[in-house]
Structures are given as structure tokens and as C-alpha cells.
Amino acid sequence: MLHPRARTMLLLSLPAVAIGITSSLILIMVMKIASVLQNLLWQRLPGTLGIAQDSPLWIIGVLTLTGIAVGLVIRFSQGHAGPDPACEPLIGAPIPPSALPGLIVALILGLAGGVSLGPEHPIITVNIALAVAIGARLLPRVNRMEWTILASAGTIGALFGTTVAAALIFSQTLNGSNEVPLWDRLFAPLMAAAAGALTTGLFFHPHFSLPIAHYGQMEMTDILSGAIVAAIAIAAGMVAVWCLPRLHAMMHQMKNPVFVLGIGGFILGILGVIGGPVSLFKGLDEMQQMVANQAFSTSDYFLLAVIKLAALVVAAASGFRGGRIFPAVFVGVALGLMLHEHVPAVPAAITVSCAILGIVLVVTRDGWLSLFMAAVVVPNTTLLPLLCIVMLPAWLLLAGKPMMMVNRPKQQPPHDNV
């Protein structure tokens, strides 16, 4: 016979697996549709019209029209495509299901149109809303927070293709007690994350790791170098933190989201022309291209880091529906490669991983997620002790500093962005 603790853990196992699978399928569906639309906008259509896909007019035109299209969705869809991600944490309160169609359409348009945001925030929002709405009907005795955690864990597992990220993130959220051990509380979320990761793996494998030279034995000077790199990345990120609420307030003085997002798309187009096609989109495929291109110089990497960080701020301030983690990782990779080119004595594995750690820490203020992203992009077990040590001064630097979020105006309804 099972112990009562085991029966309690098994109670949510089936719902957790179902939520994990569903979370992954929703992510896959959105990414597939966005990929088809992206291919149409950036490959087939310019080819049919005889226009180069990296033509300045095409880049500016597509991003401007993308902004207008997203603005129309936000303006006229029921629920106004959910909350403004610039004002929300990664894992927030559930939104009304009526806002989900508009949110999904706005996300797909942004991903396909080249906006410098990832899918993580809207996908988590969609899955939380569905899990809470359906779960409350099927199992009303389970509280909303449990459904929120399961949906978040399932989505994180699906996004990163592993349960490790969910385990790290929720280990600090689900604080155990003497009565309920931590791993008892982690059981159902990890089931959801595992189901999400395995389902994603059936269709595609998220490819985060970069072909960077292997790092051998750790030396004391490497710790100092890594801490300096992380501090530089944090400084760059804090510039974005300072700019975001000010640009957001300035742009949203115009009350019509069609105008706001149209102007935001136009600015993103100009940034895309300066940075080139590699500076567009969410950044994961593009950072692979950036590493593979041996022709980039120190100034090229610096330009890409600045352009991508500016595009991230503009996209978030404009109200595009998307997350900030994936483009932040791109910025970290560009900064790391730039610093390695500038000081070749410091291994690229250190500069890239520590830059990712610093910039993701600024964006998420989550130490575990920052460590995970740094370790998964530069997969090298020798780096793990160094990253854990570098995290300490990085965390001290950010203690008490403002987060990369905008304080929502009190007069603005929580899910109304008109």
C-alpha cells in the first residue's frame, strides 16, 4: 500500500501529464504556424516580387505592417490580446479565456514578422489561463495556484526541452515545510514539465547549445574574468531597464495601439536595417548564425548586441506580445563573443556563458534560470562551479535594483490595452 504522502502526490499526476502535453502541443502549434508565415513573408513573397529579403525597404515595410497588424488585433480583439507583457512577470495571474485568441494571433504575427521577442511569456499566459479555466470545472477543489504552477512547469519543460529548468525555477517558488517536503511539492510540476519536454521532443529538439571551443581546467584568473564579463553584461542590461519604462510611457501617450505598434514596428525596421537580418526575430536561430559566421569582428558583435538590446526595449515598450528571455540570450552571446575577440586570452566559453548569466539575471531576476541558460548555451560541466561563483557578485550588484518591468498605470484596467 502507498503511503498517504504518495497518494497525495499521485492525485495530480494525471492532470499534470495532461497539462504538460497540452502546453507542448499549443507551443508547437504556434511555432509551426509562425514558421510558415515567416517563410511566406521573408522567403517566398520577396522572391516572387523579385525583392531581396534583406532589402532595407522590405525589412522596414514588413516590420511596420507587422506592428500595425498586431495593433489592430490588440485594439479590436476581445480582451485586447491579454496584458501588456512589459507590465507583467514571466508567470502571472490567469487572464480571461476570451482574451486568448487575440493573444495567440498577436504572438504569431510578432514571431513571423521579425519582432525581437520570444514566445515564452504569451505561451505561459495562454496555458495558465486554459489550465485554470478547465481545471476549475473538472477539479474545483484544486486551487488556482496549483493549476498555475502546473501550466507554467509544463510550458517551461516544453520551451526548453528539459525538466531541469522547471525544477530549478520552482525549487525557489515552492518552499517546503516540515510537514510537506520540497520534493513532494515538486512532484506534480516536474511531471508536467517532463510531459511537456517529451512531447516537444517528438516533434523537434530545441537547439540552444553553441559550437564554442571546449573549456578545460578552471583557474583563479578565470573567476575574475567571468565576474568582470558578468558585470559588463549587467551594466548593459541596466541601461535597458532604465530605458524601458521611459520609452513605454512616451509611446503610450498615444492611446491607440495601432499607432503605437505601427511606430514601434517602424523603429524595429530601422534597427533591423542597421543590424541586418541576423538581428531580427527571437534570436535563437540567429545566434547560431552569428557564431557560425567567422567574418564578424569585434565591432560587428558590439553592433549586434546594441541593436538587439535596443530592439528588445522598443518591442517591449511598444506592447508587442512576446517574452524577453530569448532575445536577451542573443545579446549575451553577442557581448561574450565581442569580449572574447577583444581579449582572446579569456576563453569564449567564459565570456559567452558569463555574459548570458549577467544579462538574463537582469531580465528575469531569477538566479536559477540565469544559471540554466548560461549552462545550456555553453554546455560544459567544468564551467558550472565557475558560473556558481560568478553568480554571487552578480547577484550583489543587482540587489535592490529595479526590475525590467513597467509599473502599470493605476487607471489602466489590468487586461485592457486600448
Curated annotation (Swiss-Prot):
Membrane topology according to the record: Multi-pass membrane protein
Cellular location(s): Cell membrane
Pfam families linked: Voltage_CLC (PF00654)
Annotated CDD domains: Voltage_gated_ClC
Entry annotated with the keyword Ribonucleoprotein: no
Any one GO CC term of the record: plasma membrane
Keyword presence, Ion transport: yes
Signal sequence residues: none
Family, similarity comment: Belongs to the chloride channel (TC 2.A.49) family.
Protein name per its UniProtKB record: Putative ion-transport protein YfeO
Species per Swiss-Prot/TrEMBL record: Escherichia coli O127:H6 (strain E2348/69 / EPEC)
